Amino acid sequence: MGIRIATFALITLLAACGEGGKPAQAPAAAPSPAAPTPIRLQLNWVPEPEFGGFYAAQFDGLFRDAGLAVEIIKDPGGGSVPQLIARGVCDAGVVSGDQILQLREQGGELVAIYSVFDHTPYGVMVHAKDAPESLEAVWKGTGNLAIESGLPVWKWLASRYGPTTRTVVPYGGGTATFLADPKAASQCFITAEPATMDVQKVPVKVFNASESGYDPYTVVVAVKPGQVPDPVLQRFCAASQEGWKRYLATPSKYNPAIAALNPAMSLEAMNAAAERMRPLLDTPWTRANGLGSMDPARWKAMAEMLMQAGVIKSAPESSAIMRPMDTTPSKP
Protein backbone atom coordinates (compact mmCIF):
# COMPACT_ATOMS: atom_id res chain seq x y z
CA MET A 1 0.00 0.00 0.00
CA GLY A 2 2.89 2.40 0.83
CA ILE A 3 4.61 1.84 -2.55
CA ARG A 4 1.39 2.51 -4.49
CA ILE A 5 0.83 5.76 -2.63
CA ALA A 6 4.43 6.89 -3.15
CA THR A 7 4.31 6.07 -6.87
CA PHE A 8 1.00 7.94 -7.28
CA ALA A 9 2.47 10.94 -5.50
CA LEU A 10 5.51 10.97 -7.82
CA ILE A 11 3.36 10.72 -10.95
CA THR A 12 1.17 13.53 -9.69
CA LEU A 13 4.20 15.73 -9.00
CA LEU A 14 5.69 15.10 -12.46
CA ALA A 15 2.37 15.78 -14.13
CA ALA A 16 2.14 19.06 -12.28
CA CYS A 17 5.55 20.21 -13.56
CA GLY A 18 5.83 22.46 -16.58
CA GLU A 19 8.78 23.32 -18.82
CA GLY A 20 12.11 23.39 -17.02
CA GLY A 21 10.72 21.18 -14.30
CA LYS A 22 8.97 24.09 -12.62
CA PRO A 23 5.61 23.39 -11.00
CA ALA A 24 2.72 24.78 -13.06
CA GLN A 25 0.78 27.63 -11.49
CA ALA A 26 -2.63 26.56 -10.24
CA PRO A 27 -5.46 28.70 -11.63
CA ALA A 28 -6.56 31.47 -9.30
CA ALA A 29 -9.57 30.52 -7.26
CA ALA A 30 -12.74 32.49 -8.01
CA PRO A 31 -13.58 34.90 -5.22
CA SER A 32 -16.28 33.50 -2.98
CA PRO A 33 -19.49 35.50 -3.00
CA ALA A 34 -20.16 37.60 0.06
CA ALA A 35 -22.44 36.00 2.57
CA PRO A 36 -25.98 37.40 2.34
CA THR A 37 -26.99 39.92 4.96
CA PRO A 38 -29.67 38.45 7.25
CA ILE A 39 -32.84 40.48 7.73
CA ARG A 40 -35.55 39.35 10.13
CA LEU A 41 -38.85 40.92 9.04
CA GLN A 42 -41.50 40.64 11.75
CA LEU A 43 -45.11 40.77 10.54
CA ASN A 44 -47.93 42.04 12.74
CA TRP A 45 -50.34 39.42 11.45
CA VAL A 46 -50.37 36.01 9.79
CA PRO A 47 -49.42 35.44 6.12
CA GLU A 48 -52.09 37.17 4.03
CA PRO A 49 -52.26 39.26 0.84
CA GLU A 50 -51.36 42.51 2.63
CA PHE A 51 -47.86 41.02 2.83
CA GLY A 52 -48.00 39.45 -0.64
CA GLY A 53 -45.23 41.50 -2.23
CA PHE A 54 -42.74 40.55 0.45
CA TYR A 55 -43.53 36.89 -0.10
CA ALA A 56 -43.25 37.38 -3.87
CA ALA A 57 -39.79 38.87 -3.37
CA GLN A 58 -38.85 35.87 -1.27
CA PHE A 59 -40.38 33.23 -3.56
CA ASP A 60 -38.79 34.76 -6.69
CA GLY A 61 -35.34 35.13 -5.13
CA LEU A 62 -35.36 38.93 -5.30
CA PHE A 63 -34.07 39.28 -1.75
CA ARG A 64 -31.40 36.66 -2.45
CA ASP A 65 -30.31 38.46 -5.61
CA ALA A 66 -30.01 41.66 -3.57
CA GLY A 67 -27.57 39.95 -1.21
CA LEU A 68 -30.14 39.51 1.53
CA ALA A 69 -31.35 36.51 3.49
CA VAL A 70 -34.79 37.71 4.57
CA GLU A 71 -36.71 35.70 7.13
CA ILE A 72 -40.40 36.64 7.19
CA ILE A 73 -41.78 35.97 10.66
CA LYS A 74 -45.53 35.78 11.20
CA ASP A 75 -47.53 37.50 13.95
CA PRO A 76 -45.75 37.26 17.32
CA GLY A 77 -48.94 36.11 19.05
CA GLY A 78 -49.61 39.04 21.33
CA GLY A 79 -46.07 40.40 21.29
CA SER A 80 -45.48 44.04 20.47
CA VAL A 81 -43.73 44.47 17.13
CA PRO A 82 -42.26 47.89 18.09
CA GLN A 83 -40.79 46.35 21.24
CA LEU A 84 -39.32 43.49 19.23
CA ILE A 85 -37.66 46.01 16.92
CA ALA A 86 -36.37 48.11 19.82
CA ARG A 87 -34.89 45.04 21.55
CA GLY A 88 -33.21 43.82 18.36
CA VAL A 89 -35.27 40.63 18.26
CA CYS A 90 -36.04 41.54 14.64
CA ASP A 91 -34.30 43.90 12.22
CA ALA A 92 -37.49 45.37 10.77
CA GLY A 93 -41.15 45.06 11.61
CA VAL A 94 -44.58 45.88 10.25
CA VAL A 95 -46.53 48.57 12.12
CA SER A 96 -49.06 51.28 11.25
CA GLY A 97 -48.28 54.91 10.56
CA ASP A 98 -50.39 56.27 13.40
CA GLN A 99 -48.67 53.79 15.71
CA ILE A 100 -45.27 55.25 14.79
CA LEU A 101 -46.52 58.73 15.68
CA GLN A 102 -47.92 57.57 19.01
CA LEU A 103 -44.68 55.76 19.84
CA ARG A 104 -42.71 58.90 19.01
CA GLU A 105 -44.82 60.78 21.55
CA GLN A 106 -43.79 58.15 24.13
CA GLY A 107 -40.08 58.44 23.33
CA GLY A 108 -39.83 55.70 20.71
CA GLU A 109 -37.59 56.09 17.69
CA LEU A 110 -39.04 53.94 14.93
CA VAL A 111 -38.45 55.13 11.38
CA ALA A 112 -40.67 54.14 8.45
CA ILE A 113 -38.85 52.88 5.35
CA TYR A 114 -41.61 51.33 3.20
CA SER A 115 -45.41 51.58 3.20
CA VAL A 116 -47.42 48.87 1.49
CA PHE A 117 -50.69 50.82 1.45
CA ASP A 118 -50.74 54.32 0.01
CA HIS A 119 -54.29 54.71 1.34
CA THR A 120 -55.48 53.16 4.57
CA PRO A 121 -57.22 49.77 4.36
CA TYR A 122 -59.28 50.53 7.48
CA GLY A 123 -62.93 51.43 7.19
CA VAL A 124 -66.51 50.63 8.12
CA MET A 125 -68.52 47.88 6.45
CA VAL A 126 -72.31 47.82 6.13
CA HIS A 127 -74.79 45.67 4.25
CA ALA A 128 -75.22 46.89 0.68
CA LYS A 129 -79.02 46.91 0.80
CA ASP A 130 -80.29 50.33 1.90
CA ALA A 131 -76.71 51.37 2.69
CA PRO A 132 -76.02 54.96 3.76
CA GLU A 133 -74.38 57.25 1.23
CA SER A 134 -71.34 58.32 3.24
CA LEU A 135 -69.11 57.44 6.17
CA GLU A 136 -70.57 60.37 8.09
CA ALA A 137 -74.08 59.00 7.50
CA VAL A 138 -72.96 55.61 8.81
CA TRP A 139 -71.45 57.26 11.89
CA LYS A 140 -74.65 59.20 12.54
CA GLY A 141 -76.99 56.31 11.80
CA THR A 142 -78.78 53.76 13.96
CA GLY A 143 -77.99 50.17 14.81
CA ASN A 144 -74.92 48.50 16.25
CA LEU A 145 -71.39 49.62 15.41
CA ALA A 146 -68.72 47.02 16.20
CA ILE A 147 -65.35 48.70 16.74
CA GLU A 148 -62.23 48.60 18.88
CA SER A 149 -63.03 51.89 20.56
CA GLY A 150 -59.46 52.72 21.55
CA LEU A 151 -58.14 52.96 18.00
CA PRO A 152 -57.11 56.46 16.85
CA VAL A 153 -59.34 56.32 13.77
CA TRP A 154 -62.51 56.28 15.89
CA LYS A 155 -61.24 59.12 18.04
CA TRP A 156 -60.67 61.07 14.84
CA LEU A 157 -64.18 60.34 13.55
CA ALA A 158 -65.62 61.52 16.87
CA SER A 159 -63.64 64.75 16.62
CA ARG A 160 -64.70 65.21 12.99
CA TYR A 161 -68.37 64.16 13.10
CA GLY A 162 -69.19 64.23 16.80
CA PRO A 163 -70.03 61.19 18.95
CA THR A 164 -71.59 58.36 17.00
CA THR A 165 -75.34 57.93 17.38
CA ARG A 166 -75.03 54.18 16.90
CA THR A 167 -74.79 51.67 19.72
CA VAL A 168 -71.10 50.85 20.05
CA VAL A 169 -70.42 47.16 20.69
CA PRO A 170 -67.04 45.44 21.03
CA TYR A 171 -65.49 44.22 17.82
CA GLY A 172 -64.94 40.49 18.22
CA GLY A 173 -62.91 39.80 15.11
CA GLY A 174 -65.58 37.71 13.37
CA THR A 175 -68.52 38.36 11.07
CA ALA A 176 -71.31 36.25 12.63
CA THR A 177 -72.92 39.18 14.46
CA PHE A 178 -72.71 41.35 11.36
CA LEU A 179 -74.34 38.68 9.21
CA ALA A 180 -77.21 38.28 11.67
CA ASP A 181 -78.10 41.98 11.74
CA PRO A 182 -78.97 43.75 8.46
CA LYS A 183 -78.59 47.16 10.13
CA ALA A 184 -75.19 46.42 11.66
CA ALA A 185 -71.99 48.28 10.87
CA SER A 186 -68.53 46.96 11.63
CA GLN A 187 -64.97 48.09 11.44
CA CYS A 188 -63.05 46.28 8.75
CA PHE A 189 -59.65 45.82 7.16
CA ILE A 190 -60.03 45.67 3.39
CA THR A 191 -58.30 42.30 2.99
CA ALA A 192 -60.21 40.65 5.84
CA GLU A 193 -63.93 41.11 6.49
CA PRO A 194 -64.92 42.45 3.02
CA ALA A 195 -63.03 39.61 1.32
CA THR A 196 -64.80 37.11 3.56
CA MET A 197 -68.14 38.61 2.53
CA ASP A 198 -67.14 38.38 -1.14
CA VAL A 199 -66.47 34.66 -0.76
CA GLN A 200 -69.79 34.17 1.04
CA LYS A 201 -71.60 36.17 -1.67
CA VAL A 202 -72.88 38.71 0.85
CA PRO A 203 -73.16 42.18 -0.74
CA VAL A 204 -71.50 44.83 1.40
CA LYS A 205 -70.49 48.44 1.06
CA VAL A 206 -67.20 49.62 2.51
CA PHE A 207 -66.56 53.21 3.54
CA ASN A 208 -62.83 53.83 3.73
CA ALA A 209 -61.60 55.87 6.70
CA SER A 210 -59.79 58.15 4.24
CA GLU A 211 -63.21 59.58 3.33
CA SER A 212 -63.01 61.49 6.63
CA GLY A 213 -59.49 62.70 5.88
CA TYR A 214 -57.94 60.08 8.14
CA ASP A 215 -55.48 58.29 5.89
CA PRO A 216 -52.39 56.96 7.68
CA TYR A 217 -49.83 54.85 5.89
CA THR A 218 -50.53 51.25 6.82
CA VAL A 219 -48.56 47.99 6.76
CA VAL A 220 -45.45 50.09 7.21
CA VAL A 221 -42.01 48.52 7.50
CA ALA A 222 -40.16 50.30 10.30
CA VAL A 223 -36.66 50.02 11.74
CA LYS A 224 -34.71 51.34 14.69
CA PRO A 225 -32.34 54.12 13.54
CA GLY A 226 -28.82 52.82 13.02
CA GLN A 227 -29.74 49.18 13.53
CA VAL A 228 -29.52 48.27 9.83
CA PRO A 229 -27.04 50.01 7.47
CA ASP A 230 -28.64 52.32 4.89
CA PRO A 231 -27.28 50.40 1.86
CA VAL A 232 -28.93 47.24 3.20
CA LEU A 233 -32.24 49.06 3.69
CA GLN A 234 -31.93 50.43 0.18
CA ARG A 235 -31.55 46.94 -1.26
CA PHE A 236 -34.41 45.65 0.87
CA CYS A 237 -36.75 48.39 -0.36
CA ALA A 238 -35.77 47.89 -4.00
CA ALA A 239 -36.37 44.15 -3.82
CA SER A 240 -39.64 44.68 -1.94
CA GLN A 241 -40.85 47.16 -4.52
CA GLU A 242 -40.18 44.71 -7.34
CA GLY A 243 -41.88 41.98 -5.33
CA TRP A 244 -44.96 44.13 -4.96
CA LYS A 245 -44.99 44.94 -8.68
CA ARG A 246 -45.00 41.23 -9.42
CA TYR A 247 -47.61 40.41 -6.81
CA LEU A 248 -50.03 43.08 -8.01
CA ALA A 249 -49.54 41.94 -11.60
CA THR A 250 -50.44 38.31 -10.87
CA PRO A 251 -51.52 37.68 -7.26
CA SER A 252 -52.90 34.28 -8.27
CA LYS A 253 -49.32 33.16 -8.96
CA TYR A 254 -48.27 33.71 -5.35
CA ASN A 255 -51.43 33.23 -3.30
CA PRO A 256 -51.34 29.41 -3.31
CA ALA A 257 -47.96 29.44 -1.56
CA ILE A 258 -49.15 32.10 0.89
CA ALA A 259 -52.33 30.12 1.55
CA ALA A 260 -50.18 27.10 2.37
CA LEU A 261 -48.58 29.18 5.14
CA ASN A 262 -51.99 30.19 6.50
CA PRO A 263 -54.59 27.42 6.15
CA ALA A 264 -57.11 29.53 8.10
CA MET A 265 -57.66 31.73 5.02
CA SER A 266 -58.88 30.09 1.85
CA LEU A 267 -57.24 30.66 -1.51
CA GLU A 268 -60.52 32.11 -2.78
CA ALA A 269 -60.52 34.65 0.04
CA MET A 270 -56.90 35.56 -0.67
CA ASN A 271 -57.67 36.18 -4.33
CA ALA A 272 -60.66 38.33 -3.35
CA ALA A 273 -58.52 40.25 -0.86
CA ALA A 274 -55.87 40.96 -3.47
CA GLU A 275 -58.45 42.55 -5.75
CA ARG A 276 -60.00 44.52 -2.90
CA MET A 277 -56.71 46.08 -1.88
CA ARG A 278 -55.33 46.87 -5.35
CA PRO A 279 -56.77 50.43 -5.62
CA LEU A 280 -55.19 51.33 -2.28
CA LEU A 281 -51.70 50.43 -3.53
CA ASP A 282 -51.86 51.34 -7.20
CA THR A 283 -52.51 55.08 -6.97
CA PRO A 284 -51.45 58.23 -8.83
CA TRP A 285 -48.81 58.81 -6.13
CA THR A 286 -47.27 55.34 -6.35
CA ARG A 287 -47.39 55.36 -10.15
CA ALA A 288 -45.39 58.61 -10.10
CA ASN A 289 -43.09 57.91 -7.15
CA GLY A 290 -42.95 54.13 -6.81
CA LEU A 291 -44.69 51.51 -4.72
CA GLY A 292 -43.78 51.82 -1.06
CA SER A 293 -42.80 55.47 -1.24
CA MET A 294 -44.23 58.02 1.19
CA ASP A 295 -45.02 61.73 1.08
CA PRO A 296 -43.62 63.78 3.99
CA ALA A 297 -46.66 66.07 3.74
CA ARG A 298 -48.92 63.11 4.46
CA TRP A 299 -47.00 62.35 7.65
CA LYS A 300 -47.33 65.97 8.74
CA ALA A 301 -51.08 65.97 8.06
CA MET A 302 -51.50 62.70 9.95
CA ALA A 303 -49.71 64.09 12.99
CA GLU A 304 -51.91 67.18 12.95
CA MET A 305 -55.05 65.00 12.85
CA LEU A 306 -53.86 62.95 15.80
CA MET A 307 -53.23 66.17 17.70
CA GLN A 308 -56.73 67.40 16.87
CA ALA A 309 -58.19 64.09 18.08
CA GLY A 310 -56.22 64.33 21.32
CA VAL A 311 -54.13 61.24 20.58
CA ILE A 312 -50.76 63.02 20.63
CA LYS A 313 -49.64 66.41 21.94
CA SER A 314 -46.94 67.38 19.46
CA ALA A 315 -46.08 66.67 15.85
CA PRO A 316 -42.56 65.48 15.01
CA GLU A 317 -40.77 66.52 11.85
CA SER A 318 -41.47 64.12 9.01
CA SER A 319 -37.72 63.62 8.55
CA ALA A 320 -37.57 62.12 12.05
CA ILE A 321 -40.10 59.37 11.36
CA MET A 322 -39.62 58.40 7.71
CA ARG A 323 -36.67 57.60 5.49
CA PRO A 324 -37.00 58.68 1.85
CA MET A 325 -36.84 55.54 -0.27
CA ASP A 326 -34.19 55.15 -2.95
CA THR A 327 -34.96 51.97 -4.83
CA THR A 328 -31.84 52.16 -6.98
CA PRO A 329 -30.17 48.91 -5.94
CA SER A 330 -26.71 49.22 -4.42
CA LYS A 331 -24.24 46.38 -4.83
CA PRO A 332 -24.45 43.62 -2.19
Model feature map: region roles:
Residues 1-5:
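Positively charged n-region of N-terminal signal peptides that target proteins for export
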Residues 6-16:
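Bacterial N-terminal signal peptides
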Residues 17-21:
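Bacterial signal peptide processing site
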Residues 26-171, 178-188, 207:
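Short, glycine-/small- and polar/acidic-enriched structural segments
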Residues 91, 98-99, 171-264:
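Pocket-lining segment of extracytoplasmic ligand-binding domains
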Residues 116-125, 198-226, 237, 276-281, ...:
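Periplasmic-binding protein-like
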Residues 229-309:
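Secondary-structure end/capping motifs
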Residues 299-332:
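Conserved C-terminal helix/tail region of periplasmic/extracytoplasmic solute-binding proteins
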